[in-house]
Amino acid sequence: FKHYLVAYLNCSLAQKLVARRTSGNAQPKLNVGDMCLIPIPTFSDAFYKVISNLIINSENLIAASQEKYRYAEKMLVSTIDMVDRSSTKIITSLKSLSESFLTSGRLDAEYYQPIYDDYKAALKTEDTVYTLCNLYDKNFVPKDDVEYAYIELANVGNSGDINDVDSVLGKNLPSRARRKVKSGQVIIASVEGSLQSCALITDEYSGALCSTGFYVVDSDYINPESLLVLFKSKPIQALLKQRCSGTILTAITKDEFLSMPLPKIEQSVQKQIATKVQESFALRHQSEQLLENAKRAVEIAIELGEEKAMKWLKGKNAEV
């Protein structure tokens, strides 16, 4: 029954009932007591079992997707020294003026922590984001009467996927929605605390808009999937964090981003990473489809009856 409950509470009908019970202005919330008053339609055990199987299969596909992505990360680790250096015993660093401010323009002590020097040494590269990547930072002005898929920070998943993107009329878009993306590009969040929010733009979101809070890049030397895994790797994430600056909103500037070290990856390894990431994304898409089928089946059962819902699900299974 618990899996059916998950499907029901996520379907559009239940969400409307939840919204109706939500109260408050500055911080709308749903009280436990109000949640208990939301009606739950009941059906046969056979229907519950079908919905449960869909949810369980969806969870299994997500687990398989995550495993594929972890394998891609391991492929990258095999070519780059990514030993965990967070436990380094050296916590002090002495730098002369010529080695510090006159070179980097930075006076904050955090920037010169030895751990960052360790990561730079581990990458063993003279290349940077500037030499290996193309940066797309030209503003796009949306048309008022055209709908655009708008990718926000909250739409970026842990494995570099994008989901739950809303379509918004150009006139209703926020002023920061000024980057138009295309398939094969990678977006990287620029604000400290969200640097791990990197995503690969797939065909589904080609032509979408994203916030100016993302850097949009691709590369002539590194395929999109490998670029995604690289930017989400521990050394690159550490170097992104090192280069952040600011007071109210700490972020990495364009100059700091472009000058950040970035290693090349062997073509044979890139191909293997690309295959695993593509497989991961495909499995995640299948998982999402099963969840949608479960939610839609519950909606049909409520609106038209359980028999109609079961028939609809059989048709969906026949399509697979």
Residue ranges of each PLM-predicted region?
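Short coil/turn segments at secondary-structure boundaries
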Residues: R20-T22, S87-I91, P142-E152, Q242-C244
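Short, surface-exposed loop/turn microsegments at beta-strand edges and helix-strand junctions
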Residues: P142-Y148, D166, R179-V181, L200-T212
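Well-ordered mid-protein domain cores that form the structural environment of catalytic cofactors
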Residues: L5-T22, P39, K232-P235
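Non-catalytic DNA-recognition/assembly elements of restriction-modification systems
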Residues: S44-P142, E266-V320
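Short amphipathic C-terminal alpha-helix that caps PH/PH-like domains
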Residues: L5-C11, L54-S58, A72, L227-K232, ...
